[in-house]
Amino acid sequence: MRLGYNEKLVLLKLAELKNATVEELIEKTNLDQVAVMRALLTLQSQGLAKVHEERRRMIKLTETGKRYIEIGLPEIRALKILKEKGKVTLNDLKDVLSDEELKAIVGVLRKEGWAEVSKTKEGLTLKLSEKGKKAEKRAIDIALEVLSKGEVSVEEIEKIISVKELKRRKIAEEEEKVIRNVEITDKGLELVEKGIELKREVSILTPELIVTGKWREVEFKPFNIKAPVKKIYPGKKQPYRVFLDKIRRRLIEMGFIEMTVDSLIETQFWNFDALFQPQNHPAREWTDTYQLKYPEKGYLPDENLVSKVKEAHERGLAGSRGWGYVWSPERAMLLMPRAHATALSARELAKGIEIPGKYFTIQRVFRPDVLDRTHLIEFNQIDGFVASEDLTFRHLLGILKRFAIEIAGAKKVKFFPDYYPFTEPSVQLSAYHPELGWVEFGGAGIFREEMTEALGIKVPVIAWGIGIDRLAMFKLGVDDIRYLFSYDLKWLRESKLIW
């Protein structure tokens, strides 16, 4: 068996004392409490010493009690003045007693028989009695002397005075303490008798040890790489933020161009009208979207684009008959927090794009909803589109499946037919979560020609809008979407880094 310097030192002192408290070992070895306790744990694990724990009720001085040790009990201070003057009023004692002490002093002096109390013109007057002249040490005075040296067991102090009396006068307080007594075992004594060489241990070989040759006189402490150590939590990025950054980088590596915007506010023109969504569509009502109270309206883009969108709604484009109603520019000017990131896709298409071209954006969107494990009223959406001559619906399904499996880590994926005013055909993407079952990720489709032609695009455009928060739930292994924005330090510290 191998013992370190501290273990050897404690064992040698135990051999001298046979048994001792931890406090006594601290005093004898000049080690601190932590070092002694660690040494004892090692000695006990190797059967060289035994540690016995005993719970005791202990009494120790309060701050008031410590003050009385320094300046004396109130009655002792009052008695000293009485012995000097023979007779005093309560006012004469104000310099040596506090107001609270003055209230109690008459009763204490009368109880001890140290003073005679009478009423005079000057107020209550105290006169030194014969018993006061010969006053001796009382139990409380002896108890204070004992406690001044340190805490004492209740049993020990009860031999002198009632603990209840000390607590009543707020001189002392009671606490339960664990007393550790240590004894050396026969195995420990046997090892000491064989002889223990006490050498200083070092953990670092310094230049000084080499130059002076002192390395020969010391013992090098081996490193235990399996020993438990305190966990260190270095600075770390928020897990969901890392997930978003990884997706952004992955898409850029795949050749996608990122669409950016500075504002969270859109006109209804970009949020709905440019997407060929009619102005009487129920999704445009207050139950499905937020509206801005002030300012209420924004500005429409250039007249040519507005007239094309108007024509698409009223009479149709690309062989369509449109929606057959009178389109209102006033309605299109209304401002709202962005309801979906597809509004940015419409803006990008109207600006002009590379063909073939791939575009994406990750944006915050807002929709009225009931907060639960899978729904938020403010969330992130990844929106994107690909424009090219030869694109088909199967290309879109392939991209969506890749998103679900490679990015979210989903094992099962399903597609369902769906409807959106601005795509045809349309599809819903869902994936299976082990805790929540089938979870909808988002919608997708091929942009309708009525929309793309109005925006100046003549080729097929496949597009998608996916709730990226739900993708993150799969990847980060959480079953409540609200947890992605949690302040829970345990989760933030222990969440694993992702791909």
Curated annotation (Swiss-Prot):
Binding-site positions, L-phenylalanine: 342, 381-383, 422, 447
Gene Ontology cellular-component annotations: cytoplasm
Main location per the UniProt record: cytoplasm
Cofactor section: Mg(2+)
GO molecular function: ATP binding; magnesium ion binding; phenylalanine-tRNA ligase activity; tRNA binding
Cofactor binding note from Swiss-Prot or TrEMBL: Binds 2 magnesium ions per tetramer.
CDD domains named in the record: PheRS_alpha_core
Catalytic activity: tRNA(Phe) + L-phenylalanine + ATP = L-phenylalanyl-tRNA(Phe) + AMP + diphosphate + H(+)
Uppermost EC category: ligase
Alphabetical keyword list: Aminoacyl-tRNA synthetase, ATP-binding, Cytoplasm, Ligase, Magnesium, Metal-binding, Nucleotide-binding, Protein biosynthesis
Amino acids binding Mg(2+): 424
EC number: 6.1.1.20
Superkingdom to which the source organism belongs: Archaea
One biological process term in Gene Ontology: phenylalanyl-tRNA aminoacylation
Subcellular location: Cytoplasm
Subunit: Tetramer of two alpha and two beta subunits.
Similarity remark: Belongs to the class-II aminoacyl-tRNA synthetase family. Phe-tRNA synthetase alpha subunit type 2 subfamily.
The protein's name in its UniProt record: Phenylalanine--tRNA ligase alpha subunit
Organism: Pyrococcus horikoshii (strain ATCC 700860 / DSM 12428 / JCM 9974 / NBRC 100139 / OT-3)
